[in-house]
Design a protein with these regions (language model features):
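PLP-dependent amino-acid enzyme catalytic core
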Residues: 1-427
């Protein structure tokens, strides 16, 4: 069975089920796999010919082992990955791995849906309550991932009036086992309420509380799968010269890509692309870890100055004896992001700020004879207002958003007060 250890205390070892259920270890430490499996070149070639779901089952059972039988795992992955991850041609030597074809039009659908399948499988008949705070994207992905699953209730807190109306419609119109709560306060106030709930042992035990945090190991494992799916779509000559540029905020996507490489997937090198929140690029340049105050940018999902997955990146490099100076990096400011979006539009590809940053870093660093992929982490319509303004054109709403636009909001309004939240949750 799979063993994982806490990066802050290597003595704390847990099973896959424990890591999924707990999320974090003590001292808020991240869990990391004890064994790093590797496939042979022959196995990789065979896997690249499989379909997305069967291949993903093989990848994930290499990590999870017999803790979940491969047949069950494959069925659960089939429930999670119900949409494609196509590589869209942008230029002769560049493609975009589009991760926004799921129900909430963002890459988080992969991790969120697989995590939901794992949590409900592990919990069995025991009731589970997912409690999480969101500033938009994560909430939508979590809500849709758990919607309609048995024995699980989801409570999502968000700052009232501080997320886009479009995003609010995406997850506050579901009902059923999804409770959405608009809090009078900012995102930090929502986070504080979540923390209070997890400190309340009685509430935790009564409801089987779980955070479904983006740091959950099941999300990270799910994200490895789409790197294989990307390579499977490339011609042989591109596979041997592949450079992947990853838009980076919390660095989960980059961690997953590096794990794919560590499994044996042929990736020549990675580029970590950030916005003005450039803690990692500065660190890779001069070796000093010195986060600054977070700056608001166009690519707001990457407005992170202390990326919480970075310890996993460092651990993987240490374990594989890779050198950090082999990692490419770039920080792209808002002005350049806008120019790049217009440049992409001119060659026929409509993009949004996060993908544009990854493309910019890739284009600037791609060498002759190499093939480049950049990750498209969200549908341009998720950033409709800014994309329309920058590109001076109207974006049609994709079906997923249009279908929900006229539905009534089902949210409760609450003050930023734990007693009120507790009453609602116990009710």
């Amino acid at each position: 069975p799979m063993k994982l250890y806490n990066l802050k205390d290597h003595n704390e070892q847990v099973s896959f089920a424990q890591a999924v259920t707990q999320g974090l270890g003590k001292h808020q430490g991240l869990f990391f796999p004890h064994d790093l499996p590797e496939f042979s070149l022959t196995e990789i070639d065979e896997m690249l010919q499989q379909d997305f779901v069967s291949r993903s089952a093989k990848i994930l059972s290499a990590f999870i082992g017999d803790e979940i039988p491969q047949g069950v795992l494959q069925e659960r992955i089939g429930n999670a990955f119900t949409f494609p991850a196509p590589v869209s041609k942008v230029q002769d030597d560049v493609g975009c791995l589009e991760l926004f074809h799921g129900p909430t039009l963002a890459f988080k659908d992969f991790g969120g849906r697989f995590m939901a399948q794992m949590l409900t499988h592990i919990a069995g008949d025991k009731p589970v309550t997912i409690l999480t705070a969101t500033s938009g994207d994560t909430g939508a992905a979590v809500a849709h991932a758990f919607y309609g699953l048995p024995n699980v209730k989801v409570v999502i807190l968000y700052p009232r009036g501080k997320i886009s109306p479009l995003q609010e419609k995406l997850f506050c119109t579901l009902g059923g086992n999804i409770e959405t709560v608009a809090i009078d306060g900012d995102f930090d106030a929502c986070q504080a309420l979540v923390k209070q709930a997890f400190d309340d042992e009685e509430l935790k035990a009564a409801l089987g509380l779980n955070s479904a945090n983006s740091i959950n190991i099941s999300r990270l494992l799910a994200q490895i799968c789409y790197y294989f799916e990307a390579v499977a779509q490339l011609p042989q000559e591109a596979r041997n010269q592949l450079v992947i540029s990853v838009p980076s905020g919390n660095f989960g996507d980059l961690t997953a890509g590096l794990l794919a490489k560590s499994l044996g997937l042929p990736i020549k090198r990675f580029i970590a692309a950030t916005n003005a929140n450039d803690t990692v690029p500065r660190f890779l340049q001069d070796g000093n870890w010195s986060p600054k105050a977070t700056q608001a940018t166009l690519s707001n999902a990457m407005d992170v100055s202390q990326p919480n997955n970075w310890p996993r990146v460092e651990e993987l490099f240490r374990r594989k004896t890779w050198r950090l100076n082999e990692l490419g990096y770039a920080a792209v400011d808002d002005e350049t992001t806008k120019e790049t979006m217009r440049e992409l539009k001119a060659i026929g590809y409509t993009s949004e700020p996060h993908a544009a940053i990854a493309y910019r870093a890739l284009r600037d660093q791609l060498q002759a004879g190499e093939y480049g992929l950049f990750l498209g982490t969200a549908h341009p319509a998720k950033f409709k207002e800014s994309v329309e303004e920058i590109l001076q054109e109207t974006l049609p709403l994709p079906k997923e958003l249009a279908d929900r636009a006229d539905l009534p909001l089902l949210s409760h309004n609450l003050p930023a007060d734990f007693a009120a939240l507790r009453k609602l949750m116990m009710g």
